[in-house]
């Protein structure tokens, strides 16, 4: 009889331990999804601003139709993405298109003098700053989840429960354009 009790206690401890691992992984996954919800709010605001921005520049940038089309297509793709990883990839593309747009705007001094355009640019800049802040929070939550998935003994059960390492929301190739200091010419 004592052997049976020992076996039952060991089995109970193992079951409780596995449940604790599962619950920890679920909590971390939910934290990541909640962090992305904050990003989603800012992305929606950016998506809503893009048509206004394009409308404001159409008259000035007649020769840049390809750029404006690329921005519109990237926006539509981003709005149509459903999973977090699809949205991340689509938003990288939109960020790249907007970055290229900002570079081309430099060639249009009349456009830069437009108060409507400048207001939209300021709004876009504010949204980008908010996005940077919530992206840091999202990446922190993603990092915590990835570490938990990689740690032993969690790694033994994570894939069995459907948990895997998740993608961070970095700027990818557009990072250099966002981080490059503006060139000042006199």
Which ranges hold each PLM region?
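A helix-centric hydrophobic-segment signal that preferentially recognizes long
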Residues: 1-186
């Amino acid at each position: 009889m004592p052997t049976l009790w020992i076996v039952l206690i060991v089995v109970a401890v193992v079951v409780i331990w596995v449940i604790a691992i599962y619950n920890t992984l679920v909590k971390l996954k939910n934290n990541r999804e909640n962090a992305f919800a904050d990003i989603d709010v800012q992305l929606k605001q950016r998506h809503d601003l893009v048509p206004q921005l394009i409308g404001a520049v159409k008259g000035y940038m007649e020769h840049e139709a390809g750029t404006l089309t690329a921005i519109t297509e990237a926006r539509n793709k981003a709005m149509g993405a459903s999973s977090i990883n699809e949205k991340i990839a689509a938003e990288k593309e939109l960020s790249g298109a907007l970055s290229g747009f900002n570079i081309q705007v430099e060639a249009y001094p009349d456009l830069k003098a437009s108060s409507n355009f400048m207001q939209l640019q300021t709004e876009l800049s504010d949204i980008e700053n908010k996005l940077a802040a919530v992206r840091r929070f999202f990446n922190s939550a993603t990092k915590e989840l990835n570490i938990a998935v990689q740690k032993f003994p969690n790694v033994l059960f994570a894939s069995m429960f459907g948990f895997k390492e998740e993608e961070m929301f970095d700027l990818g190739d557009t990072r250099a354009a966002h981080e490059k200091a503006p060139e000042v010419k006199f």
